Design a protein with these regions (language model features):
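Positively charged n-region of N-terminal signal peptides that target proteins for export
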Residues: 1-4
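Bacterial N-terminal signal peptides
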Residues: 7-16
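N-terminal leader/targeting and pre-domain segments
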Residues: 21-46, 155
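Thiol-based oxidoreductase modules, predominantly thioredoxin-like and allied folds used
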Residues: 30-32, 72-97
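Local sequence-structure signature of Cys/Sec-based thiol-disulfide redox active-site neighborhoods
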Residues: 38-71, 75
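Hydrophobic beta-strand anchors of alpha/beta hydrolase catalytic cores
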Residues: 50-52, 85, 114
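Structural alpha/beta surface segment adjacent to cysteine/selenocysteine redox centers
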Residues: 91-110, 120
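Non-catalytic, surface beta->alpha helical segment in thiol-disulfide oxidoreductase systems
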Residues: 109-158
Length: 159
């Protein structure tokens, strides 16, 4: 029995240590509204859309998604070629009403949530990340489909 308890303790400690070592992409010190406006300016200059990955360093699924999209070469290229991608910090205990209004009440979906903004900064899609999940991670095909379907070229193809 002691061996089982010890093995479980080691497994829990290992999982916690792995989570603690993941990159922390959310900057808790910057103004998220100013961050979004800067990203929109960059999108206008580069002909891209903006993806705001809203969440926090406190959120294991947010960190998993960040790791997933950067470690998969195809997804990383799809994102970098088509989007200005930012991590918008949302405090664990809730953030500003202004940010919620700016990004169409995103918190109703849980975290992370991806908000796609067009080149003018208007939210055009909110992606509930639970639809991209598979098991204890994310599904590559669903994630690629999301990013492909919301590129500027795809959305504006009939204009």
């Amino acid at each position: 029995m002691k061996k089982i308890v010890f093995a479980l303790l080691l497994a829990v400690m290992g999982a916690g240590n792995a989570w603690a070592q993941m990159e922390k992409p959310y900057n808790e010190e910057i103004d998220p509204l100013a961050q979004i406006e800067q990203a929109v300016k960059e999108a206008q200059q580069t002909g891209k859309y903006v993806v705001c990955q809203v969440g926090g360093n406190w959120c294991p699924w947010c960190l998993k998604f960040n790791k997933f999209i950067h470690e998969d070469a195809e997804i990383a290229k799809l994102v970098s070629d088509n989007y200005v991608y930012i991590h918008v910090n949302w405090p664990r205990r809730g953030g500003s009403v202004e940010l919620q209004k700016r990004l169409n009440n995103f918190a109703r979906f849980g975290f992370p949530v991806m908000v796609v903004l067009n080149s003018e900064g208007t939210p055009i899609h909110l992606q509930d990340s639970s639809f991209l999940e598979e098991g204890s991670g994310y599904n590559k095909e669903k994630t690629q489909r999301f990013f492909t379907n919301w590129t500027k070229a795809a959305v504006e193809s009939l204009k």
